[in-house]
Amino acid sequence: LLDHTDATLAALKRLRAHGISVALDDFGTGYSSLRYLRAFPFDRVKIDAAFVGELPSDEGAGAIVRAICNLCQAFSLSVTAEGIETDPQRVFVKEAGCSFGQGYLFAAPMPLESFMAYLDQMRAA
């Protein structure tokens, strides 16, 4: 993103113009940057599993998750917590302000056909 800011911004705007939501993945690690929240038209931020995996026992990870949720709320962005594996993690991220969660607590990665069957099963429940 940093090397091609103008091209990236134009591409993201085109995607959004076609009704495609854009997420900033793995936020809080690697090359993700606070600057991206202001510079690019994201709809959602995905909190990296590295923080979620330490919840709820690691106070530092908890503080980071809460801070990301608060920051995203200020920018009107929805938040997804990645890597939820336990119910205490689910409860923590929900209380912190995460709108969505993903991880093995809900389901393992699966091919499209299996996902469609899973989705039908969830709708019927």
Tell where the protein language model's regions lie, with residue ranges.
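EAL-family c-di-GMP phosphodiesterase catalytic domain
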Residues: L1-D6, H18-A125
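Catalytic-core regions built around general acid/base machinery
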Residues: A10-H18
